Design a protein with these regions (language model features):
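N-terminal small/polar loop signature for handling phosphorylated ligands or for N-terminal nucleophile
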Residues: 72-160, 305-323
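Internal gly/pro-rich beta-alpha loop/helix module
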Residues: 125-126, 131-233
Length: 515
């Protein structure tokens, strides 16, 4: 068993893949403990580790294999001299063979079993959620739930209201293990776990959408089947720190670290809404990320009002007509407004390394010709990363942001396939997708990034990493991880509000790496 700490890549398997691995694991279990027995032991050990002096361990058990894991855990806790109570959902139901055997063992040991929720708990008690796990079936808001589903929702709500700390077994009940969405989308009822012990595999839904909030501190027990994971292609992989950069040579010069040009920042004269700050933030991020030269190109370039002075003296200003699109990396769209539409055809056709953000994506979503130009870039060996938030992704997919959020992994993969580029779908558990690559879910970042301008910072950082020689996919993975890590470190030190400007200043470049 290990506590997940995001410092190394981790394969993520969806429910179908986990079932496949479970079958492989069961096939090789002979006279030793069953997978359920191993799972129950792991749950009991973790329960004791996180709450060693709990007055009582309440084990809430559903009718399936997840409930069986909980029953096995109850047996161990009882045998170790702890006060244990089992709350059994619909005891009259027929249970899987292993779970029925575990229930018989619970009864034989004289462990207290009840079929109704307790009215109240000691605040120091520990609840073990073994109700659903990955056995969750999706319930759409418009469908009529069955009596069993209604009862389970009542249990989930009841356990939530009891207020004691919860250890979830595999996946918090009410959370979809594949998508990180809630089973009941109309009311969002789910278990809010303090800890989650994932069993056999790590699941993508625990790291994106609502997963990170619902799971709390995450642990993994592979039940001795880690070697079997190599036989199944994962649904995704957890992002990890980028590969270490080489020590810069003493003879390096500013050209050694790449050029980045930021195109955007629509003038206030056009629509009464100046957005030059978006370019300044992206430029600051690129500069602090170690780019050798950073240029700002404010739009429209033929307007006197576009002669905005960059906030940082180190950032050079360029007229769009004078910009060499084939050199370095181009970041296009940050605060671009309507003006970005005029420069996009040239940017899409000529730039070699390109990051498209914000208004550039909105323009492409409205114009089939621009969309085709974007698709053609891959055939010309031109490299593109797009960085939509859910609403921008929805516009590109001609759907709603709700549908995008319902399955973030699928949405990002669909966009990558359609537009022939690397996609960074921003949000909790940012998804990075590219055709022919295993999709990546990012574990870093927090709500401090939910403020204006942080997306511009990410775009500038991404441009710098591309300019420094990383491939489009590598640059996306590295930038997203670093971007989130800065916000996580800020929370650790409990500093004041994190602004986008401060976020950009805290990014580090390869020249500052320790060696």
């Amino acid at each position: 068993m290990k506590k997940l700490n995001w410092q190394e890549p981790l394969a993520l398997f969806d429910v179908a893949q986990t079932r496949q691995l479970e079958s492989l694991g069961l096939a090789r279990v002979n006279s030793g403990p069953s997978l359920m027995a191993q799972a129950g032991l792991a749950v009991a050990k973790l329960a004791l580790a996180i709450k060693p002096f709990a007055p009582c361990y309440w084990v809430f058990c559903g009718p399936g294999h997840n409930g069986g894991d909980g029953l096995e855990a109850a047996k161990h806790l009882h045998q170790w001299g702890r006060e244990v109570r089992v709350v059994l959902w619909q005891p009259e139901l027929k249970r899987p063979t292993d779970a029925a055997k575990a229930l018989a063992g619970v009864n034989a040991l004289g462990i207290a079993v009840q079929a109704t929720l307790p009215e109240k708990l000691d605040s120091q008690d520990l609840c073990i959620d073994a109700m659903l796990g990955i056995g969750l079936r999706s319930t759409l808001p418009t469908s009529t739930p069955s009596p069993s589903e209604t009862l389970m929702q009542t249990w989930i709500d009841g356990l939530y209201q009891l207020g004691a700390d919860v250890l979830a077994v595999d996946v918090p009940s009410g959370l979809n293990a594949n998508t990180g969405q809630f089973q009941n989308k109309s009311n969002g009822l789910h278990i809010q776990a303090k800890h989650t012990l994932q069993l056999l595999t790590a699941k993508p839904g625990c790291f994106t959408a609502h997963g990170r909030d619902a799971c709390g501190t995450q642990w993994l027990e592979t039940l001795g089947c880690e070697d079997l994971q190599k036989s199944v292609t994962p649904a995704a992989q957890l992002n990890a720190p980028a590969r270490k950069v080489s020590k810069p040579l003493h003879a390096s010069h500013k050209g050694s670290f790449g050029d980045v040009a930021i195109v955007g920042g629509e003038s206030v004269a056009l629509r009464g809404m100046g957005m030059s700050g978006a370019v300044d933030l992206a430029a600051s991020a690129a500069l602090h990320a170690g780019a050798g030269r950073v240029m700002a190109c404010y739009l429209p370039s033929d307007s006197n009002s576009a002669l905005h002075t960059p906030v940082l003296a180190e950032v050079m200003q360029r007229n769009f007509a004078a910009l060499n699109l084939k050199a370095g990396a181009i970041v296009c769209g940050c605060g671009g407004g309507e003006a970005v539409r005029q420069v996009l055809p040239k940017v899409l056709q000529e730039s070699v390394h390109l990051v498209l953000d914000a208004d550039a994506l909105n323009a492409i979503s409205k114009d089939p010709w621009l969309r085709d130009l974007l698709r053609l870039r891959a055939t010309k060996k031109l490299f593109t990363v797009i960085t939509p938030h859910p609403l921008e992704a929805a516009r590109l997919l001609n759907t709603s942001s709700t549908e995008v959020q319902n399955d973030r992994l699928f949405a990002a993969q669909t966009l990558a396939e359609d537009l022939k580029c690397t996609v960074v779908l921003k949000g909790s558990g940012t998804v990075i997708a590219k055709t022919s690559q295993t999709s990546i879910i990012n574990p870093t970042g927090n709500a401090r990034l939910a403020t204006g301008g942080t997306g511009d910072v990410l775009a500038g950082l991404l441009g710098a990493r591309m300019a420094q020689g990383l491939s489009d996919f590598e640059a996306a993975c590295a930038a997203v991880f670093e971007h989130g890590q800065v916000a996580d470190d800020w929370c650790f030190w409990r500093l004041p509000t994190l602004t986008a400007g401060k976020l950009a200043e805290l990014i580090r470049g390869p020249q500052t790496a320790s060696w």
